[in-house]
């Protein structure tokens, strides 16, 4: 109920109707799932990114929010828990900016650069600094509460931020709601950093896989990779393609190398059409 009231209060303009020329999310998810080779598990979630507006009655806003929610789709693994790897950096960035915006913390001089590097270059030391500085576990809990993310939780081992848990449907919900839950300037910053993702990460890992390997230039993306929690290798990719949010979370056996995992995730991402002109 809290989320419904929140969505109604910001008076959404986006709705769940398919954009002309785009397949419906329920049609797209099976295509993406089928394009993933049998190397591991792929979770897929697709949603429409929402935008704030004005001029709707409460009833109309609630109806529109319901259509947006109904338009989201996922495969059988969309609600399965995965270690976040670097996806948690999105939560950290949003919560640091939110707490600074609401007067709950004062940004230090180096924080803006750390936040940007953490998203654009997937900089792990930057993430670790912010995690320790501002209580990362608390940040994950706070974001999960404010966005209604039921499958998202901090890591069991303190400090191991990449082992926080989330689901594809939670990440899709987060990116869908970002423009209407976060302050517009904060949402714009996060999405701008995602659009400016660097081909090589801070640690030298090539980020051009999954959605970053197939979506049009300038697409807002975030990549994640990690080995080897529970004997598995994880490779994740999320993006906002036009007005569509796409989340791909993958898990392969440790014996499957990054090259094969990257190729598999990129194959799945290639099934997603570009946005209409």
At which residue positions do the language-model features occur?
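Secretory targeting and sorting signals
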Residues: 1-20
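Short, hydrophobic alpha-helix immediately C-terminal to the catalytic nucleophile
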Residues: 93-97, 128, 172
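Short, histidine-centered active-site or binding-site loop motifs used for metal coordination
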Residues: 96, 122, 250-252
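Conserved catalytic neighborhood of penicillin-recognizing serine enzymes
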Residues: 101-150
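A short glycine/small-residue-enriched secondary-structure motif
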Residues: 61-62, 66-70, 93, 113-120
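Active-site SXXK
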Residues: 80-105, 118, 246
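Penicillin-recognizing serine hydrolase domain
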Residues: 16-74, 131-277
